[in-house]
């Protein structure tokens, strides 16, 4: 434990290989460790040019003062090494000075931060790796001292600096070296026996000792020394914190650890325990090291929320015992995580975590566990070891769930498209990253990273040519092409669509190619489902097809059956209506979540014209159809088919390009352009009932007749001459058989006889038990009786 008064250290403790075990360090096994003065160490390296040596602290509990140091490791070389290093030193010296004066206690008498920066720039050593394939060096400020715990605390802010800085060397700083038992390769030595590269001096006039971070030669006039606030107060000035276990419980743990009787135990209080030596009566050997007794007494001190029992005199002659004072450290960790606003619960009871700068949904508990491990860089250093234990992580996980009370609304940003590295605003063309994206809580992501500024102009031109073949930009196909662009670009928007869309055409007309391109762009937001969502009844029972639609932005249903077959089920009109509602009811197996938010553009890929079990105005307002009339083939035979407008050669390499996501960013760029063209400021897609054969009867009927009402009473006398009768209210109506005869004059009975009968069955009314009538008036009859008035 470092004290407020710094003591010099001229003995360098070295490891002779990486990963020396603790027992070899403690036993001073000369095969693995050795101690040198600076001159001895320099001579040893000169005599053993192939040696591997790493300097480290021998006993951090006893002594942990070090020089401020940085380790940089980057692949590749710098074009302007001098200027890059100069900029790096400027950034780092300011960072160290800011941290020392703003977050720490400056023990030395210096109060001028600018002078400290200037002095650091004049008093540093820097090594250089002989490896020409990488940029690697150690930077040591030999006039700037601190403690290891202070460097560990500094690591959090250094991580932030490395993430936010644009300097390549700053980004390449290895922050993992700031830990307990750190080691740094000594200048002039190899990493291992296989590696031929070493770190060499860059300035021969700088003494060898100034290339060592554990060498301490402190001078109050010329050197700087700072420690963290908590460490500066420890041990004598640190008060007993409220969150610690009760003091008498701590004394009980101390007594148990000592084993022997503590004669002055009653004299020890929370105010004096750090300055009162323990008077131990050794009835049995020491419980810590098993020696018969000790000449010097044991003492207590506080460090990192722990009581440490150490022996005065030679502290290495007895083991140091550590007793935690935290009442519930795991709960404290949970509270720190909650305060960072990185975990929430949705109104569906699903947990969301902010992990690697994106919101992720926890379908199981794996993401919460990953979050806990990921937070180790954002928690205090004494918490990180606790996170390594799986049992501790499970406790923290349950704590987090129990501490979340209020649910939050999610996915309320229809114009936001989430990627793995941020959120893209498709309306304003802005890409949000990091904390800027955090406010947009989107639980479903495309599953890949957005590449900003990527040049895809050539690929876009190639892809646009393919799309122009699938849906030609001709005068005859203008409306079809426009609807095609509107539908595809609507997939980007996370809101309920007013229509279901049919892609209708023969085989090899580009429907599947369109689907694959959409899947490449939308990826995890794309769902391919079966025809059951259209033909089977939708209820609250298990329906994984519907449950998987939750928050998806594209749902593709391929290959509807041939409706001309008697065994084929027709499309249920009720299902169409439900699929255009904001909430679709259906649950996964073994799940109670039945309400699924419907943000999808639902596209039906079919070779057969759709047929519905019933047709009304509501269903006609919900259907749009795109015809695909370009046939792609490489056959040498001529293709004669009235259903094709164009015959184009088949590109056999197209599938492999799409599957490799070759067109991903190009198609995304095209979709964004179409979105701005059609859907800003509002989403706009109109139905096309006139393209659906099943709707033609209904559309024609509506152009022939109108429902009769009280406004037609004044025409009763004239209408009765045309075969009309009156109902109980005096409103003109037609007898059922006369209505059927008049309607049949406008239709081919062989084609539409069943539709006529179905319409009559649905709308007929009864005057009495025997007489049936239809409460409609033919528009042509109204025109006939009004003609004389107009003349």
UniProtKB/Swiss-Prot annotation:
GO molecular function: ATP binding; DNA binding; helicase activity; hydrolase activity
Catalytic class of the enzyme: hydrolase
Any Gene Ontology biological process: DNA replication
PANTHER family: ATP BINDING PROTEIN-RELATED, SF3 HELICASE DOMAIN-CONTAINING PROTEIN
Ranges for region Primase: 346-471
Protein name: Primase D5
Organism of origin: Fowlpox virus (strain NVSL)
Residues annotated to bind ATP: 505-512
Oligomeric form and interacting partners: Interacts with A20.
Family classification: Belongs to the poxviridae D5 family.
Function: Primase which may have roles in initiation of DNA replication or lagging-strand synthesis.
Taxon lineage: Viruses, Varidnaviria, Bamfordvirae, Nucleocytoviricota, Pokkesviricetes
PROSITE patterns in the record: SF3_HELICASE_1
The SF3 helicase domain, residue ranges: 479-641
EC annotation from Swiss-Prot or TrEMBL: 3.6.4.-
UniProt keyword annotations, A-Z: ATP-binding, DNA replication, DNA-binding, Helicase, Hydrolase, Nucleotide-binding
